[in-house]
Every structure is written in structure tokens, then in C-alpha cells.
């Protein structure tokens, strides 16, 4: 923070945000409402924190910010497999599902 930033009301940006407990609750609810769910952990990038993508049997998916440890714990709690997307990639059914979605202009 610069010397005058505090006087101007500027705040530092960046830093690690803590995962939202509501996100974990949402992921549990989402997974329990679908079958054949698998978790794919996406690594931290310069733009985003670590995230997990849950993919159902039909390719429907959802993504939320969560720690890798949290994602593994979620998988254990739900009894679903957890994969590292950097090693295994995304499942084809996820790409097929996304391709069928209506295009937004």
C-alpha cells in the first residue's frame, strides 16, 4: 500500500480469499441431487484460486472455489472420486453437455 492510499480510501487488492462455507454446502447439495458425480480439482492460476468442478453422469457440471484439501474431503464425504484435472483432463461428457447448451450472443 502506498503512503497516501490509506488517506484516499484505497484498499489492497489480491490475496487469497477463504472458501465460502456456502459453496461447500452448495456442492454437497448439487452432488446429492445427481448421480454418477465425479470431482475434478483445477489448480490455482494467476487469475483464480483452486476450484473444483463436479460433473454428473450426463455431463452437467458446476464449479466452485475450494481448497484442494477441501475438495478431497468433499469427495471422501460424498464417496465420489476426485481427479486432478491437470493430469486426467475434463471428461468428454462435460464437453458434450457444454456443446449442447444454447449459444448466447
List PLM regions with ranges.
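Intrinsic disorder
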Residues: 1-105
